[in-house]
Amino acid sequence: MKKILVTLLFLLFGTVANADCNIKSGSINILANDFPALRTLVETAKECKGSADFKVTHSAEHNKIAVPALTANPSEFSVRVAANSSIVPLMNADLIRPMNDLVKKYGKGIQESQLITIDGKVMAVAFMANTQHLYVRTDVLKENGIAIPKTYEEVVAAAEKIRAAGKMKYPYAAAYKAGWNLAEEFVNMYIGHGGEFFKDGGAQPNINNAKGVATLNMLKKLADLSNPDSLTHDSEAIKVEWESGNVAIMTLWASRSGTLLDDEGDAKITAATKLVAPATVGGGNIPAATLWWDGFTLAKNRSDADAEASFRAMAHAASSKEMVAKAADQAVWLVEGFVPGPKSVGVIEAVKMGAKPYPMLPQMGLMHGALGSEIVEFLQGNESAEQALKDVEAAYITKAKEQGFL
């Protein structure tokens, strides 16, 4: 198995000037998720396009689009903005190219700590860190005599007290949308319980156990305190719930905090919104959360000219001190010159608490996919936790055998 060498550093060492923007040729076509920090990054890259063609697709469906689009020859996109999990299927299918030569030639503004290096090959350049953590309404907690929760058991108790007081019917929210989002909630909670997804460093599944059952039971308790339509709610949907005043405690990505704390919306809710550390669970001492990086990769099935133009534009953005100064509240930037502010607290606390990175294992995408589809019936009350976990392992094993992991 490949050794993954990834470092997320928040006290980053100095480097020299930003990327040169004198691009004369090539085509730049970027696929990225859709949230403010990534739009800022892509707009900064566009400043450097020179004479190159420049297109971008921001989509919440980026994970579904990426592999088919990069499998085409030539690839539909020259750049895929990826993260811990989404880079793995690209590497498994040999769809992205190493960037060592381009880093050496054009990467003077990029810090070594930003380089995602796998078996000596630079496969991505990271520009921001992310995690999911708690958001709380301090006014609602104070009114009900509730301390800021530090564990998910305390989250459940707090939400039950708020509901019992008649303040809110569904006081908790998290991105439980069936599929990728729901699976991510399981991953976080299972890691918080000390779970390991695979046996003995191999690819045999290892979730049908007491920790897996405890994970599902906690997810069910939280789901029962959430909107009845929670299995359709992604990050954007729960932000709407928060801004509508329907929720007092929420688990959400750090990168989504910007629009919750801006000048738009209900001033009372904004003033009472506080970002705090991720919660622990089950008596564990590490967060029930995972650390993530976002970075850019280059498609293999594009010309060298397109790869060079794309790298230079993206390297300009991924090393822009001006960008991180202007957009300091949008992300925890892994770029020289970034000064963490109040909106960075969730990521910084997660690091201090020893949060684990999302598992960058070749077979993890198959496990994630199985979780996203097979635990839904349990949360709907239609089957037991044990049966749901059996279903997950069976679905995973089928896919793992098809792809040669088992």
Predicted regions span which residues?
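Glycine-centered hinge/linker elements that transmit conformational signals in sensory
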Residues: 159, 202-231
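C-terminal lobe and pocket-closing loops
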Residues: 255-270, 281-373, 403-405
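Conserved C-terminal helix/tail region of periplasmic/extracytoplasmic solute-binding proteins
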Residues: 22-27, 142, 324, 353-406
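Conserved N-terminal structural module of periplasmic/extracytoplasmic solute-binding proteins
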Residues: 4-9, 19-86, 148, 231, ...
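Extracytoplasmic/periplasmic solute-binding protein
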Residues: 123, 132, 156-204, 247
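A structural signal for short loop-to-beta-strand junctions that line the ligand-binding cleft
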Residues: 67-68, 75-78, 106-141, 170, ...
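Short, solvent-exposed loop/beta-turn-alpha elements that line the ligand-binding surface or hinge
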Residues: 97-110, 171-177, 193-214, 262-273, ...
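Hinge/lid segment of periplasmic solute-binding proteins
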Residues: 84-131, 147, 156, 185, ...
